[in-house]
UniProtKB/Swiss-Prot annotation:
GO CC, alphabetical: cytosolic large ribosomal subunit
Native source organism of the sequence: Bacteroides thetaiotaomicron (strain ATCC 29148 / DSM 2079 / JCM 5827 / CCUG 10774 / NCTC 10582 / VPI-5482 / E50)
Gene that this sequence comes from: rpmF
Family per record: Belongs to the bacterial ribosomal protein bL32 family.
Region named Disordered: 1-20
UniProt name for this protein: Large ribosomal subunit protein bL32
UniProt feature, compositional bias: Basic residues: 1-19
InterPro entries for this protein: Ribosomal_bL32, Ribosomal_bL32_bact, Ribosomal_zn-bd
Domain of life: Bacteria
Molecular functions (GO terms): structural constituent of ribosome
Signal sequence region: none
Biological classification of the source: Bacteria, Pseudomonadati, Bacteroidota, Bacteroidia, Bacteroidales
Presence of keyword Ribosomal protein: yes
């Protein structure tokens, strides 16, 4: 396997890692139930997506 000829400096390593940060998910409020959910996904609380029922949720007994 290939090996580096020279050691990378701390500055060069840090510059490469500037893009490795975690990105917070974009959230939206569900117009059906008012809960927060991730964009372009089914609401976990009510099961609606874009105004239509996508997943039938069981009622809590």
């Amino acid at each position: 396997m290939a090996h580096p000829k020279r050691r990378q400096s701390k500055t060069r390593t840090a510059k490469r890692r500037t893009h490795d940060k975690a990105v917070a998910p974009t959230l939206a409020i569900c117009p059906n139930c008012g809960e927060w959910h991730v964009y372009h996904t089914v609401c976990g609380a009510c099961g609606y997506y874009r105004g239509k029922l996508a997943i039938e949720k069981e009622a809590a007994v």
